[in-house]
Amino acid sequence: MTIILGIDPGSRVTGYGLIKESDRKIAYIDSGCIRTSNDTELSHKLLQIYDGICELMDHYSPTEVAIEQIFMHNNPNSALKLGHARGVAMVAAASHRAKIFEYSAREIKQSVVGYGAAEKDQVSHMVVELLQLNRAPQKDAADALAIAICHSHMRNGLSKLIGSRGTKRRRMRL
């Protein structure tokens, strides 16, 4: 059995989703959001994200972590803040000796929905279907679960079934 933590990083809201994989079957464990205080400095927000991810790592002990890659924003300042949030999430996971994998938004959508340009509501719907949930999780948590599902598919060779047109296996980061 493998426990996978999916992370959808953000400086205000970082989504997380935990699934377990056993015999190529996935099951929901937990999901939610780490919300940072609006009135604090960036350094304090980053510490809140770091502490939140560390708490998840301590409680659930995932051995693999999947995180969304940065995409270019129109606003460079937003991209920098997202990069900082992503960085502290990765450091928190790495400090717990988890293997870290990165996927682009297109790869995640392709893996979960079957279409790399899928809309957010399509991704959320497939998360509910694949994990047999009663209702859709919060937006950022649903995205994080999609990232975890994508990693499960990739580690089980979905990329070979889709072919080079769809997605490619990502390098592991330690």
From Swiss-Prot:
Binding site for Mg(2+) 2: 68
Enzyme Commission number, as recorded: 3.1.21.10
Classification of source organism: Bacteria, Pseudomonadati, Pseudomonadota, Gammaproteobacteria, Legionellales
Cofactor needs: Mg(2+)
Family: Belongs to the RuvC family.
Coiled-coil stretches: none
Residues forming the catalytic site: 8, 68, 140
HAMAP family: RuvC (MF_00034)
One GO BP annotation of this record: DNA recombination
Gene source species: Legionella pneumophila subsp. pneumophila (strain Philadelphia 1 / ATCC 33152 / DSM 7513)
Protein name, entry field: Crossover junction endodeoxyribonuclease RuvC
GO CC terms in record: cytoplasm; Holliday junction resolvase complex
